[in-house]
A protein has these predicted regions:
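Primarily recognizes the serine-hydrolase "nucleophile elbow" in alpha/beta-hydrolase
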Residues: 138-198
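C-terminal catalytic histidine-bearing segment of alpha/beta-hydrolase fold enzymes
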Residues: 229-280
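The feature captures the conserved acid-bearing segment of alpha/beta-hydrolase catalytic domains
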Residues: 174-237
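Conserved alpha/beta-hydrolase
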Residues: 91-116
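N-terminal cap/lid segment of alpha/beta-hydrolase-fold proteins
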Residues: 24-59
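Short, surface-exposed "cap/lid" segments of acyl-processing enzymes
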Residues: 56-98
Length: 280
């Protein structure tokens, strides 16, 4: 009679784990999809990515590597058996589930662990950062069978995406830069000094016409698109906005027009075609 009682703690633990997963899914709908932290050990530090995919059998081909905005530090970690990370409200982080289909995997790229205190813009230009991202993407390719990668950055994360792609043309077929930081500021040079001739990947600019952030002005997006000779997708409408001008829930983060913006980017990845303007 007493033997079955040995299984009660296991059943309770399983129920608690399932309840925790459901609670996480309610707080962050992206966590309702299969996800895991992929970590690569480097020389005394690690670099990790948060991988999300559809459940069931997938024939994965496309990988979308997302580089979030300032400070670009997710701090992917486990606390009390639960996945924890920062920047959940970031445009790319909060919308990542909308990329998913049977052929597509999404990975949000964290800063290298030894740069969690300060992830400077200048560091993202260095060969070491390029090698770190390459190691993570190569491991994701090996584990999941992805053969076609697009690097996507938003705001300050555009620097990460651009330089990681510039240094790894064999991995990044395409780069999409959204709400990009164009001008120099206290955090670094932005994209003000980049050499577009050094980028071999296909490039797409995506920007909201009413972006209120002074470091990411729409007029600069127009100028950089012309300078690079690459297409610019203009996003209009959306809202309502909340928070500061350079924060994620304003036009800077495509609030209210996220899905239409992602659909245009997805179309470009698959077909090379995008509309000139996007509105909800």
């Amino acid at each position: 009679m007493g033997a079955p009682n040995r299984f009660i703690p296991l059943v309770v633990a399983a129920l608690l784990a399932a309840g925790a997963a459901q609670a996480q899914g309610r707080q962050d709908p992206n966590l309702a999809y299969p996800h895991e932290v992929l970590t690569v050990k480097r020389d005394g530090y690690t670099i990790a990515g948060l991988v999300t995919r559809l459940p069931g059998r997938n024939e994965l081909k496309y990988g979308v590597a997302l580089f979030p905005g300032h400070p670009g530090i997710l701090k992917l970690r486990q606390e009390d058996g639960e996945l924890k990370f920062d920047l959940r409200g970031n445009f790319l982080v909060r919308t990542r589930r909308h990329w998913l289909d049977r052929e597509t995997l999404v990975m949000v790229v964290d800063a290298p662990s030894d740069h969690w205190p300060t992830f400077y813009q200048e560091f993202r230009e260095t060969p070491r950062y390029g090698a770190d991202v390459a190691a993570l993407v190569a491991e994701a390719s090996r584990k999941f069978g992805v053969t076609d990668w697009t690097f996507i950055g938003t705001s300050e994360g555009s620097l990460s995406a651009f330089h990681a792609a510039r240094m790894n043309p064999e991995l990044a077929r395409r780069v999409i830069l959204t709400s990009s930081v164009f001008v120099a500021g206290k955090n670094g040079p932005g994209l003000s000094r980049v050499n577009f001739d050094a980028l071999r990947s296909e490039l797409l600019w995506v920007h909201h016409a009413d972006d209120p952030c002074r470091f990411t002005a729409y007029r600069d997006a127009q100028a950089f698109a012309k300078r690079s000779g690459k297409p610019l997708v203009t996003v209009r409408g959306g809202g309502p906005a909340r928070g500061g001008a350079c924060e994620a829930f304003t036009a800077h983060g495509f609030v209210g027009v996220e899905i239409a913006t992602l659909r245009a980017m997805h179309s470009w990845i698959r077909t090379g075609q995008v509309p000139a303007d996007i509105a909800p």
